[in-house]
């Protein structure tokens, strides 16, 4: 919870609004109750009964924050967007923070010109099968293992 401590010590001029985003199939904060059988492609947030439930609710309330949820389809679309546009290969659970920020900025819930920080802690290699299943692989090509062949294959397929 270091934000409050930094603010109280005079090391920060304000505290952030804390937002929480959950997958629709594992969204106890949205439902207001435990989810007995949470299900989502985002395995790192497949949690139906968070251990820090009370702390998360308190922090959200104190910071004027909120919770929201996203479908697996939205989460995967954001994971793909991050890879294609930013070169960031994160796991689905990390992509949800960006999905939330984008939606809330677009809707005006997050005001224009706000500073926004999205934490993406999970690398895409934590869940490579999900990422691979989302790829349009096209057809495979065989090449000789030389730099010239690799370069030619890339340039020929752009």
Language-model features: locations:
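Short glycine/serine- and small hydrophobic-enriched flexible loop segments
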Residues: 1-5, 58, 99-106
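Active-site/ligand-binding loops adjacent to catalytic centers
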Residues: 3-89, 133-158
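Substrate-binding/catalytic subdomain of NAD(P)-dependent oxidoreductase enzymes
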Residues: 16, 76-83, 87-106, 114-116
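A broadly conserved detector of short glycine/acidic/proline-rich loop/turn motifs that flank catalytic sites
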Residues: 24, 94, 122-123
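Catalytic phosphate/nucleotide-handling subdomain of diverse soluble enzymes
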Residues: 98-158
